Amino acid sequence: MSIQESAAAYESATQFFLNLARGVAKDQLDVKDPEGWSARQIIHHLADSEAQSYARLRRLVAEPEGSIIQGYDENLWAVAPQLGYESAPVENSIAIFAAVRAGSLDIIKRLNESDLEKTLSRAHPKGGRGDCRSDDRTRSRFGDNRSGD
């Protein structure tokens, strides 16, 4: 997939999720899906995930190959009452998601082929090595996957 195609897929997935999130009726926000997640929890989770991905993308571009990127335990974040996954209004998380995705899209559009091959080591629950190409594929689909697509 070319950089332009990646950017278009990323932008499309962003708009898909934003339309879906903004369209959830207030009385449906706390209905759990078969996996146990409510729309409210998914919206908050995606805002957190995108904030992490934005920082990771910036590090992939700016730091030397082999640098360590730090992950986070999304399951612990989901159950920390202070983070509000169960009760906080979703408007701020939707705004965070939109802003961070817009910032990431700006970066993606400026990438070149050599940027896509750069790798970083992950201090991340899923471990391994990452590169811009695989992280970009994950980010372009992630909103669709978590929103039931």
List PLM regions with ranges.
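Extreme N-terminal tail/first-helix region
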Residues: 1-16
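Short amphipathic alpha-helical segments at helix-loop
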Residues: 2, 38, 82-89
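A short, structured beta-strand-centered segment in the mid-to-C-terminal lobe
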Residues: 9, 84-99
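Amphipathic, well-ordered alpha-helical segments in soluble domains
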Residues: 13-20, 49, 100, 107
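Phenylalanine-focused residue identity feature
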Residues: 16-17, 85, 97, 142
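Extracellular-facing binding/remodeling surfaces
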Residues: 23-27
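Short, contiguous alpha-helical
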Residues: 28-82, 102-149
